[in-house]
Amino acid sequence: MSSASPRDIARTVEGRANDYANDYAELHCRSQFSFLHGASSPERLVEVAGQLGLSALALTDRHGFYGVVRFAQAARDTGVRTVFGAEISCGNGDIVVIADGPSGYVALSQALTDGQLRGSKSQPIFDVESLAQRVSGECFVLTGAHEGPL
């Protein structure tokens, strides 16, 4: 059994990561528009995703589509495909809702607006049942968020 230095291991892992990177898409990523939850600009997120060789990146800011225009513009000329979604606080925790195409974007936009109108500034109120009705068949829901129900 031969020994390897940490640098050799890092090079090997890095090489393998690059082999498989195109098969991976990050589906839960918050930008600086998610106050106290995200730090990087949408442009920087796209830049790093490209450096890592990700095939796609979902921008899922809390309770809104705040960074999607800048995100889409930054990704336009890169190989990184964009996915739009939002992290939503409702019921027993946070869920991530990802739009399935343009009709999903519209449905999720309406659901986000509903929650914002039900609550107050910076305190939206999302009802699980009405959210489910709004996005049913138009979006994917991930329940394993950091503070999610699973």
Language-model segments: residues:
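Phosphodiester-processing cores and adjacent nucleic acid-binding clamps
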Residues: 1-150
